[in-house]
Amino acid sequence: LIEQLNSLNMSLIVTAYTQEGIVIGADSCITTNFTQEGKELYKHSHCGNKLFLLNKKIGISTCGDAIINGILLSSLIDQYIWSKKEENITLLQVEIDLKNIVNNQAKGKEYYVIFHICGYENGKRYVSKFDNNDKESHIKDVSERDGCIYDGQVDIVDLFSQDVAYRGTDGLYYDINIERCRYNELSLQETIEYVYFLISTTIQHMRFTYKKDNVGFPIDILVIMPNESLWLQKKELHIPGNY
């Protein structure tokens, strides 16, 4: 008897924006936690879709709850993208719509989904990081600054971007100097490699530790440029080679 079931894609999504374009990356792991006969168990899937392209110009990525009231979030987003394929939709409207999709499907139950959306409008570069419970818009014009946002299992990524200290034998804490990423100098190819590095390093770190494997291959990579977009890496339906 399964007493409780929760499906999370609390994995890792990364969106980096530099002079030549925006690069979005997402892993494919979905962790299902459940209680059976009083024991807490979990299962992994490495087929989760968390990265999407709307009308060849807007990138969407997700982490958090992967199943909303019995329906895969990826299925809900795919249906939404199909319904908007003929529309000249704005980032602001996408932000509003994604919140409504989750909250309407939730039917009063509590769910937590983080979204990244990004793209170009009127020659300007925009990114947004929000969750389904946010009441305000978080769209930011980042045309004049380069950087990176990330969500999900972020503890390893934090080591490359956040201030870190260690505790000495004297009980005092000492700062460790972090070499910041030179976002403003990165080419588009370097930005792609950087996003892939952050996600793949997190996956490999979990492999060699006792951490639960909440992040896993394959990694999907989407690139958005001012006048075009392209999938550099995207999972496809296939017959598994081991059968």
PLM feature spans:
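N-terminal nucleophile
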Residues: 5-243
